[in-house]
Amino acid sequence: TSRRQRQMCIRDRNKPKIAVLFGGCSEEYDISLQSAASVIRNIDGNKYDIINIGISRHGVWHRYYGPADLIESGAWESYYKCPVAFISPSRDVHGIVEFTSMGTCCERIDAAFPVLHGRNGEDGTVQGLLEMAGIPVIGCGMLSSAICMDKDVAHSLVKSVGVSTTPSIVVRKNDDMHDIVLKASKLIYPLFVKPARSGSSIGICKVERETGLASAVSSAFEHDTKVVIEQAVNGVEVGCAVLGGCSEPITGAVDEIDLISGFLDYEEKYGARTATIRVPARISESLEERIKQTAKLIYRTLECSGFARVDMFL
């Protein structure tokens, strides 16, 4: 693109340009839309120039000029002004390339906020593109995102610094099912079978006895080629937000997830049919402080930056 074409897209340089990325070629596409709509509504437009970049379920990138309501409803692609656009890996561009009726034009971005969930967005792929382009990333970077997305790798790292993890095994899609069942026999039922690199509890099954293991593993392999099988933890799930960027990370209040039955699957996580989130958690001050310190340790161990949420069991 020529310098003149690039100048076509220049806006008010007094306000930093923040690109909000949403959607994505992921099973968690719908959740990303809900999150992005909330983020967009809460960014101060008087301070920042918001550039919305939507990624379709099929992986097509667009510059979206419409309201947040259409993102939330899932109808954003039908908006009349939604041209194809993408983030250029070139540091010379340092932003997006947009295809318009007048040709292509470029617009510089000061920072990018990937509000993407799951594979192809939360796993380091988009973060790597942004880092290569020289665009600052709001949230965790490429390495941390990739580490946190893989349950096996994340658990191994936090275990190495003294954080307790439940006994587990890792199996691969080309493993013989008989060998998988035999390998899992050293664990105590009930077990949880989880795709190693899937979020929002998608593909997770709770298995009460050995007869149900093969079916659960086959189901998990539909979402990933790597599966974690772990012992269930009989405890209360707690968690807190951690915010970095300063010498000492800041933690939010500790919350507690109160479940009447079952586990926190996709429907419970986003529909809260029977789950109740209690803030603050019903715990002692000393235990709350221990949880916060453990959350900070995990945050540092997994190389997190910006904001993160750390969950654990008591």
Where does each model-flagged region fall?
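Short hydrophobic/aromatic-enriched beta-strand-loop microsegments
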Residues: P136-C140, T165, I250-T251
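ATP-dependent carboxylate activation and anion-phosphoryl transfer catalytic cores
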Residues: R13-P16, F22-C25, G162, R282-L314
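ATP-binding N-terminal substructure of ATP-dependent carboxylate-amine bond-forming enzymes
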Residues: R11-I138, M142-L143, I147-M149, V153, ...
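Active-site nucleotide/adenylate-binding loops and adjacent lid/helix of ATP-dependent enzymes
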Residues: N14-F22, S26-E27, Q34, M102-C106, ...
